[in-house]
Design a protein with these regions (language model features):
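Conserved C-terminal helix/tail region of periplasmic/extracytoplasmic solute-binding proteins
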Residues: 306-333
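Secondary-structure end/capping motifs
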Residues: 237-313
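Short, solvent-exposed loop/beta-turn-alpha elements that line the ligand-binding surface or hinge
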Residues: 58-59, 210-222, 288-297
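Solvent-exposed, acidic/flexible segments
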Residues: 68, 72, 141-145, 172, ...
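Short, glycine-/small- and polar/acidic-enriched structural segments
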Residues: 30-169, 185-191, 202, 207
């Protein structure tokens, strides 16, 4: 499986990637039964607000929440093996897992794309085309790099992998170091890594993934999705109400994110352990927190899948058939 951008966010030892922070928090029994929701520590999807405000418990569930540090792989494995019932996940990796036979459904969305190209402040880069021939640090296996490369190729007609000098990095801190030492002119990364570089004054946003998307697709509205919610098919069949309740919980979390930002950032700091000043910048720079699975959102998601298939990230024939995608990949409450 191609590695997603969140595999490379702040992690401990490899073993810690599969560990669960502090174990699951089991809450008092509720009328609808138990649901186990696990999420990535640095997911940037407002799931931590659902957890800390127990927004599923408030909808009648005995909710068990687990925070998973590091890579998305172990989190997907937890869902596939039915150790948890629902997770947040990169949309591209969700599609890849579906191709690979994981019995899951996308029930809702959580956050728009988080990627960006950040230029070194004194590199003399003013527009995307200026990247030609320049040195760019990137983690080539990530879905963010793949998406930004595909969108640049589609929107600007040049290939970041062939028309620039890609310096392969192993982690976000590696990219930050390369930029700081002036060994590269730009980095291709994602929130909150990009925000921390800009906050420290080492880089400036050259272009955000959302703007590349708008240029490449001609879509002036709608938000391409980075993070979505997945529910295991078996649990969903037995408990179909979880889809709507999870979307409603996310809606409340998004409301807190925008209307009670101090509380939202307090929760994010508690879960992510990131510095508060970085969280403040990242909160401000976040493209859009999302919820639900409205018609317009589904159309945007189908367009994302088409691009991922067109440029080789996805392989299955299902992504050429919007009706099959709606029927087999999505579950709309």
């Amino acid at each position: 499986m191609t590695i997603g951008r969140r595999e490379f966010l702040k992690t401990g030892a490899a073993a810690a990637a599969a560990a669960w922070v502090g174990g699951p928090a089991v809450l008092s029994a509720q009328g609808k039964g138990k649901v186990r929701l696990a999420y990535l520590q640095l997911g940037w999807a407002a799931t931590e607000i659902i957890h800390k405000e127990d927004l599923l418990g408030k909808r009648g569930w005995a909710a068990e929440y687990s925070i998973v540090p590091g890579a998305p792989g172990p989190l997907l494995n937890q869902l596939a093996s039915k150790n948890v019932d629902a997770i947040d996940m990169s949309f591209a990796l969700a599609a890849k897992a579906f191709e690979d036979g994981v019995p899951l459904k996308v029930t809702g969305v959580a956050t728009a794309v988080l990627g960006a190209i950040v230029a070194r402040k004194d590199a003399g880069l003013g527009k995307v085309e200026d990247l030609k021939g320049r040195k760019i640090a990137a983690i080539v296996g990530t879905s963010t790099f793949f998406d930004i490369r595909a969108l640049t190729l589609k929107g600007y007609g040049f290939d970041l992998q062939k028309d620039t000098q890609i310096v392969t990095a192993t982690s976000p801190p590696d990219m930050v170091t390369l930029l700081g030492k002036k060994e590269v002119d730009a980095i291709i990364a994602w929130q909150p890594i990009t925000d921390s570089v800009v906050f420290r004054g080492e880089g400036v946003y050259l272009v955000k993934q959302i703007d590349l998307w708008r240029k490449a697709t001609g879509r002036a509205s709608g938000f391409p999705v980075h993070v979505c919610y997945l529910v295991h098919n078996e649990f969903l069949q037995k408990n179909p109400q979880i889809a709507g309740d999870l979307n409603e919980a996310q809606k409340d979390a998004v409301d807190i994110w925008y209307n009670k930002p101090a509380r939202a950032m307090e929760i994010v700091a508690e879960v992510t352990k990131l510095p508060k000043d970085v969280i403040q910048v990242a909160h401000k720079e976040t493209v859009r927190m999302l919820h639900g699975l409205a018609d317009e959102q589904v159309e945007t998601l189908i367009a994302q899948l088409k691009i991922n298939k067109e440029f080789g990230f996805l392989k299955s024939d299902i992504w050429d058939n919007p009706d099959r995608i709606r029927r087999e990949f999505f579950h709309r409450a």
